[in-house]
Amino acid sequence: MRSLALSLHQKYNHTKMKKYIIDLRVVSLQHFNDKYVLLKLSSDEKLPAMLPGQFVEVRVDGSPNTFLRRPISINLVDYDRNELWLLVAAVGDGTRHLASLHEGDTLNCVLPLGNGFTMPKTPEDKWLLIGGGVGIAPLLYFGQEIVRMGAKPTFLLGARSESDLLELEEFCKLGRVLITTEDGSAGEQGFVTNHS
């Protein structure tokens, strides 16, 4: 089966994709720890085409110190359920406010932004996807689309400690997962860029 993202990438390669401003409803929040939260958002309308590696800009209403939209990587898109997942690291006023949202709250988003990742040309291509911390966010959607093409990615995921390893079950469903933690509490000790 041909991947939606691959066909979209071929269609929109070297052209600008149309941008949309849409309201998305929070359908669930998953707090991994006090720093990371997964927002699952839903639209009443059909979601526009989005490529792995693209991002959204989220307007943060109700945060007095946040004037600009916050860029957040697209973690996953489920077109059948009309859901968009965003993995947020609560490190500033704007992202802390996003992490404190509740089910039913609405977020105004501009999407899709950015060019997206280069997709494999054939299922035989080998892919090593590397990310650490919240930088793993776009790799889940990317890995999902690589698997849909028939390829098998390997993920190299890093975090400060075991409690900061995010969405491991989801990644393990898609391919081999190698882990690096800075404190050595899981996987190999060190930075993800130094994994052996």
What are the functions of these language-model segments?
Residues 14, 18-21, 156:
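Intrinsically disordered, low-complexity regions
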Residues 3-4, 44, 134:
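Generic N-terminal simple sequence motifs
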Residues 13-16, 59, 145-146:
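Generic alpha-helical secondary structure signal
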Residues 11-13, 35, 190, 194:
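Intrinsically disordered, low-complexity N-terminal regions enriched in serine/proline/glycine
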Residues 1-16:
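N-terminal amphipathic/basic-hydrophobic helices that include classical n-h-c signal peptides
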Residues 18-103:
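Ferredoxin-reductase
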Residues 93-196:
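FNR/FR-type flavoprotein reductase catalytic core
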